[in-house]
Amino acid sequence: MRSRGLLPASEFTQAGCPQLVVFPAEVTPDEVEALVVSLWEDAGWLAPGRLRLSGQAELAGPFQLDQSVREALNLPAYSEIAFRLDCPPMRSGQLAEELRGVDLLSDAFAASEPIGLEFEALSGLLAICRRLGGSLRVGAGSSAKDAPAQILSPDPDSAVNLAVYSPYWIEKTSIQELLKPVLGELSLDPGSRERPSRSQRRLEREAESLVTAQLGKEKLDWIVAEAAAFDQEMGNQLTNGDAYALYGSLGMGADFFLGVEASLQVPSVLRFHPHSGKPFAIYQLQWLGQPQGNRRLNRVERVARMKVTHAFEDAARLLAEAAEGTVVDEDSFLVTWN
């Protein structure tokens, strides 16, 4: 997709101006389109330079950014390309005082909260920025009458939780055995977890790198066969009555749970899956220690997040292999590994 030229900075200096999304030079319009299409069913290029998100919400671009534009609009130094959001404004009024500091996007529009299609578009673009290392520029006057423009740059590492969608159901005892090398002991009781000792943590780290060798092809084949047999027996009768949750801990601040349920509802990105329209088994990995609000994580929290992230990735790989699953992150984007 060709650039539409240099972004006209003068169009974005006044209150009420359109919002912008900006990305580093290595991000291509095709990557942006792929994520847009995964979020919205009616998304796609309408014409050169016009990418529909949903309904009347569109992105115009890409535009080039030079140093003078970055300085004029106070954009991050890495910004090289930009898209303008064209969307009919839909607002509900000021953000309630007790809700401030909870959500990055809501705080940015505290003076007049977006709702409906505008909120959906902004939320989706913020998720795309998190995935691609970009930023959302919110125009002046959005958080307060005389407030300057704001730059929202979500931390790519903040996307921790994963879900695996599979045609096959794995029972509690089998999943505990499958995931023990990477998640440790999993319990039905959220209050019964013991903090792992230093030696236990060392053993778990070693197990992560040796998980395939430890389980072996025969064990994985057995779990796959059991899941397939259960699915054949149950057919399309999987319901939330089969749901269960398991709890575990990887250390201080690194408590988590694995929720397993059946559902016909899947993210838009899976709408073309061969199993679409039938019940999926959903294996949800969620970090319980995630801090609330927009504050910066301290060192202990960052270490805990890193532990959980690595363990979740290993667990999701195992589940995807054992149950022929598809991994989706908390922003509803596909996750793949080389």
Model features per residue range: what roles?
Residues 1-338:
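Acidic (Asp/Glu-rich) sequence patches and key acidic residues
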